[in-house]
Amino acid sequence: MTNEFHHVTVLLHEAVDMLDIKPDGIYVDATLGGSGHSAYLLSLLGDKGHLYCFDQDQKAIDHAQEQLKPYIDKGQVTFIKDNFRHLKARLLEHGVTEIDGILYDLGVSSPQLDERERGFSYKQDAPLDMRMDSQAALTAYEVVNTYDFNDLVRIFFKYGEDKFSKQIARKIEQARAIKPISTTTELAALIKSAKPAKELKKKGHPAKQIFQAIRIEVNDELGAADASIQRAIELLALDGRISVITFHSLEDRLTKHLFKEASTADAPKGLPFIPDELKPKLELVSRKPILPSQKELMANNRAHSAKLRVARKVRK
């Protein structure tokens, strides 16, 4: 399993160290993935500390159960197989009403990208799937073959920010009228054919943004992140911290907006003083996002777009 689930953790020390770990604290890894952040966080906990790990991918949990066995044996880890949008409800089931810190590593993990049959990558021929939870109902196949023209344009533009969204949606509509589009390479070729020649000369794969858009739609990634981060802020104890790693502008803008909203006083301008109940709930630990070091960028190409934002709870 270890070899099958190889994952290089991004911003490992930065994301965990910025949580200011208390040895006896209660922490959450909202995106277990390859368990790199969890392993490092657990190494900083004392015997009374506990970590709750969320992932909707059973393979990630199976891998972590091998990697984190010493901590499991000591009763310091609880795995929860669910979408992190249900974070608060699932933690309440375990009697957890307050946490000292939480970490998010948003986006797709390397094993999911690299596992051909998951259909996340435009670089490998595979069935159109893209589900992070293999038990979920909606697949990329259904999005590509059943969404109408306007809905395709909407998700391509909104989640992929691709200026050729209409042309690509039209190509898909024409192709699927003849036969269903069933593989990643079929879809990638259609996307490429919809773009002008000068666009194809630009750096990066022409299908990258559209694949991202479909993946976000299939997994409702932004909706889940929005709901989860808001619940996480509610759960944080005073002085508790939240670390969020993002990999594209949509995730980063969402995180920045949620942090700004919670770190701004909810009071009209001009008041002589701000009542306690209207004071900000969060304080930004770093005003600008923390970026990977040059050393990390050289060692891990997937770290290039990573950004880390951190905030601290200052009011319940």
Swiss-Prot record:
InterPro entries with a match to the protein in the record: RsmH, SAM-dep_MeTrfase_MraW_recog, SAM-dependent_MTases_sf
Keyword Methyltransferase: yes
Reaction it catalyzes: cytidine(1402) in 16S rRNA + S-adenosyl-L-methionine = N(4)-methylcytidine(1402) in 16S rRNA + S-adenosyl-L-homocysteine + H(+)
GO biological process: rRNA base methylation
Enzyme class, UniProt record, top EC level: transferase
Gene3D superfamilies the record matches: Putative methyltransferase TM0872, insert domain (1.10.150.170), Vaccinia Virus protein VP39 (3.40.50.150)
Residues reported to bind S-adenosyl-L-methionine: S35, G36, H37, D55, F84, D105, Q112
Organism domain of life: Bacteria
Entries under Pfam families matching the protein: Methyltransf_5
EC number: 2.1.1.199
GO cellular component, one term: cytoplasm
Molecular function terms from GO: rRNA (cytosine-N4-)-methyltransferase activity
Keywords, alphabetical: Cytoplasm, Methyltransferase, rRNA processing, S-adenosyl-L-methionine, Transferase
UniProt cross-references to PANTHER family, sorted A to Z: 12S RRNA N4-METHYLCYTIDINE METHYLTRANSFERASE (PTHR11265:SF0), S-ADENOSYL-METHYLTRANSFERASE MRAW (PTHR11265)
Similarity-based family: Belongs to the methyltransferase superfamily. RsmH family.
Name of the protein this chain belongs to: Ribosomal RNA small subunit methyltransferase H
Provenance organism: Streptococcus equi subsp. equi (strain 4047)
Name of the gene this protein is made from: rsmH
